[in-house]
A protein has these predicted regions:
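Mid-domain alpha/beta scaffold segments of enzyme catalytic cores
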Residues: 1-220
Length: 220
């Protein structure tokens, strides 16, 4: 299980949980909502052995909780961190695909880049795949209205496809609207398996393998 940091306090909490439990790892990042805090507030946290990625980071032009110019700077700085530390990069992007892609092109895409809680369609997934990135689908893919997202899940190669819950948010159907839990990730996998006409066990095996590729720090 990977628990995600979004600012200094949540990154410290993620490290604490990862340090106390076997099979749990942490990421350290500055979410675009908190970009105004500055990336220097988290850079001392990457030395912990259970920290396996930078993020989540990126751009969120839906809420704009931090000014967009600061979001862009913080995202670029965290891409540079991922390069310098040779760590995977976990990306959050909302209503900002073009800017996200432009910054990645400018800074260079880290070898293990993950588009977390992917919300795009076939065109966006194609660009992510062109970057060599992994694409992670959450409970949103189970929603009846998520037809473009479902189309993307059908065409994403299995060796690049990940699943997640984004707990405590975005509980999958039939639990939509409830507090989400990591234990519900099989519902996401089973839904995608049904979309693709394959067995849920095949999705379980492929996503386990792809997760170890995306996050080398958790590989056995």
């Amino acid at each position: 299980m990977i628990t995600v940091g979004c600012d200094r306090p949540t990154s410290l909490a993620a490290i604490d949980v990862a340090g106390r439990f076997e099979g749990v790892w942490a990421t350290v990042g500055l979410h675009p909502h908190d970009a105004k805090d500055g990336v220097d507030t988290i850079t001392d946290l990457f030395d912990h052995p259970k920290v396996i990625a930078v993020g989540e980071c990126g751009l969120d032009f839906y809420y704009d909780n931090s000014p967009r110019d600061l979001q862009r700077v913080a995202f670029a700085e965290q891409i540079q961190l991922a390069h310098r530390l040779a760590l995977p990069l976990v990306i959050h992007t909302r209503d900002a695909w073009d800017d996200t892609f432009d910054i990645l092109r400018a800074e260079g895409v880290p070898p293990n880049t993950i588009f977390h809680c992917f919300t795009g369609g076939p065109a966006e997934v194609a660009t992510c795949l062109d970057f060599g990135a992994f694409v992670s689908f959450s409970g949103i893919v189970t929603f009846n209205t998520a037809t473009d997202l479902q189309a993307a899940a059908k065409i994403c190669p299995l060796d690049r496809l990940l699943i997640e819950t984004d707990s405590p948010y975005l509980a999958p159907t039939p639990h939509r609207g409830k507090r989400n839990h990591p234990a519900w990730v099989p519902l996401v996998g089973a839904f995608i398996a049904d979309l693709r006409g394959i067995a849920a066990e095949d999705i379980a095996a492929s996503t386990a393998a792809a997760t170890c590729l995306a996050f080398p720090g958790i590989a056995p």
